[in-house]
């Protein structure tokens, strides 16, 4: 650990640049403040500066964006974001990490410290009223055990979010970006596509994390529809999502059978399917988000 780190003095950096965290700094911070990554919170800290810079570049955020970061951890990605944008709102569930992050930023990027706001909250339950301002972009290394519900909750709760670039487990990334008809297409695929266009945006190696995870990681990008093709209000979204859940709850059954409970009977399910222009013998994995919207009666 350097003298500057030991004395908690600000580290001298070029104006507008943060001293990003490397493996030594990540482990030192964790040890100094008793932070131990927990499986329960899905914590794996990125310690590679090139990786976090690549994430920021891939996200395509600019100075005017208000970036929401979920699970900032020790601040690796946070400080890379602060190099580029004027405002970062970091939502952290771990009180120790939430308390430490502003201090780390003040030490390693003192001239950028006023760009950061930390919100101690559970991202799966955080309310718009808890988040200052209107975030335009979500850029995050999401906790892998709750990545999909967090992503969907934030897009549903924060209509100001125009785009997201998130790092998740590679298998989850593939499912989110899957096309109708593929074996991995399912509930996450359709629900994410309800909000916008979804695509894979790259892979991330295991060796950039501490501790090293047992799974591969990938980047996913979601761009919210500039002109929503269907209503996005909560009532309509819940109706559509209920149809999606029912269709995939019994994945191998035809939609006529799978949707019988949702519709009230097989006959009513068939009537609704035909009214939406969907063949009743089709399976849910063949339908895109637009088809589920028609089925729920909201297009």
UniProtKB/Swiss-Prot annotation:
It is an enzyme of class 2 (transferase). It catalyses: adenosine(1518)/adenosine(1519) in 16S rRNA + 4 S-adenosyl-L-methionine = N(6)-dimethyladenosine(1518)/N(6)-dimethyladenosine(1519) in 16S rRNA + 4 S-adenosyl-L-homocysteine + 4 H(+). The keyword Cell cycle does not apply. Signal peptide: none annotated. Belongs to the class I-like SAM-binding methyltransferase superfamily. rRNA adenine N(6)-methyltransferase family. RsmA subfamily. This is Ribosomal RNA small subunit methyltransferase A. The keyword tRNA processing does not apply. GO terms for cellular component: cytosol. Keywords: Cytoplasm, Methyltransferase, RNA-binding, rRNA processing, S-adenosyl-L-methionine, Transferase. The gene is rsmA. The lineage of its organism: Bacteria, Bacillati, Actinomycetota, Actinomycetes, Mycobacteriales. InterPro entries: KsgA/Erm (IPR001737), rRNA_Ade_diMease-like_C (IPR023165), rRNA_Ade_Mease_Trfase_CS (IPR020596), rRNA_Ade_methylase_Trfase_N (IPR020598), rRNA_adenine_dimethylase (IPR011530), SAM-dependent_MTases_sf (IPR029063).
């Amino acid at each position: 650990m350097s003298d500057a780190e030991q004395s908690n003095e600000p580290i001298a950096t070029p104006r507008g640049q943060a001293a990003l965290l490397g493996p030594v700094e990540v482990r030192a911070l964790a040890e100094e403040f008793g932070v131990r990554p927990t499986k329960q919170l899905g914590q794996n800290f990125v310690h590679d500066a090139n990786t976090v810079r690549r994430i920021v570049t891939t996200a395509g955020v600019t100075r005017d964006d208000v970036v929401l970061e979920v699970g900032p951890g020790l601040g690796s990605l946070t400080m890379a974001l602060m190099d580029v944008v004027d405002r970062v709102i970091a939502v952290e569930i771990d009180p120790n990490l939430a308390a430490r992050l502003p201090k780390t930023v003040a030490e390693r990027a003192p001239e950028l410290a006023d760009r950061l706001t930390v919100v101690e909250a559970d991202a799966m339950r955080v309310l718009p009223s808890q988040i200052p301002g209107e975030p335009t972009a979500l850029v995050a290394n999401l906790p892998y055990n709750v990545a999909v519900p967090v992503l969907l909750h934030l897009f549903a709760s924060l209509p100001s979010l125009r785009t997201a670039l998130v790092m998740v487990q590679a298998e989850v990334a593939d499912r989110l970006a899957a096309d109708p008809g593929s074996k991995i297409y399912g509930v996450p695929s359709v629900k994410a596509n309800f909000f916008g266009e979804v695509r894979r945006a790259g892979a991330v190696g295991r060796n950039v994390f501490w501790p090293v995870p047992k799974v591969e990681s990938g980047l996913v990008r979601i761009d919210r529809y500039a002109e929503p093709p269907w209503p996005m209000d909560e009532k309509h979204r819940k109706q559509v999502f209920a149809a999606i859940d029912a269709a995939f709850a019994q994945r191998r059954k035809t939609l006529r059978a799978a949707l019988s409970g949702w519709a009230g009977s097989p006959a009513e399910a068939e009537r609704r399917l035909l009214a939406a222009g969907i063949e009743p013998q089709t399976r849910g994995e063949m339908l895109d988000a637009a088809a589920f919207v028609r089925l729920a009666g909201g297009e």
